[in-house]
């Protein structure tokens, strides 16, 4: 089980990313616009720097919903590999069966 602080920190980052997503996209559009003047692009860069660092989606970590484990997490289920195996063995995930060939 991951520390509660790490799980909460990740949730906070997700909330910040959602809150600032539109603002980040608008500012990045100005920064990447080749038709904008250098002054406009510079001002946009300054505004971009004022956005919190944790608002960047890159800083989020995909974690297991049950344990908070940061590695070995399947996107399809949102669970870590260990929990997927435990739940699948109990037959609680529809359509998932143990492989045999």
From Swiss-Prot:
- Keyword annotations of the record: Ribonucleoprotein, Ribosomal protein, RNA-binding, rRNA-binding
* Molecular functions (GO terms): rRNA binding; structural constituent of ribosome
GO CC, alphabetical: cytoplasm; small ribosomal subunit
- Report the record's Gene Ontology biological process terms: translation
The secretion signal range is: none
Q: Which Pfam families match?
A: Ribosomal_S14 (PF00253)
Q: Report the protein's function.
A: Binds 16S rRNA, required for the assembly of 30S particles and may also be responsible for determining the conformation of the 16S rRNA at the A site.
Q: How would you summarize the oligomeric state and partners of this protein?
A: Part of the 30S ribosomal subunit. Contacts proteins S3 and S10.
Q: Which family does it belong to?
A: Belongs to the universal ribosomal protein uS14 family.
Q: What is this protein called?
A: Small ribosomal subunit protein uS14
Species this protein is from: Neisseria meningitidis serogroup C / serotype 2a (strain ATCC 700532 / DSM 15464 / FAM18)
